[in-house]
Amino acid sequence: DENLFQDYCIGALEFIFYPNFIKPKKEDRIHNGRKRIDITYLNAANDGFFYNMRTSPNIIANKIVVECKNYNHDPENPEIDQVSGRFSPTIGKFGIMMARNFENRKLFIDRCRDTLKDSRGLVIPIVDEDIINLLKMIEKQERESIDGYMYNIYSEILKD
């Protein structure tokens, strides 16, 4: 169910990325209600990966845009375009695509790279396996490793 998956995403991301992600808003309406974002958070990061995304002149991630895809197939170009279509000068150009898994992760990373190269913003994929890995870091008292994990995904997207 789409609603349950959104609730899972809100809770997981807020717990994992606290205190960087604050004030989650489900079904955030923009453009006078003509468009909807599954989840937004204010980016309150004062250091690390999300701070760098907030202060990067090409990203300016004031908000974290999250689209949730509870599919049994890989999200494709239209789903990435949906995320980047929610970016704006006030929101910024950073988003997370939450999905269950990727049959072809490399292809999805390539699509994220295309979006970034076309100056349409940065979309970071996070799947169930990533959530489990991030929660294990917290369980082992290694919360400081989360930034490195995010930088690793970002580095995959930057590779040519």
Where would I find each of the regions flagged by the language model?
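Catalytic core segments in nucleotide and nucleic-acid processing enzymes
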Residues: 1-160
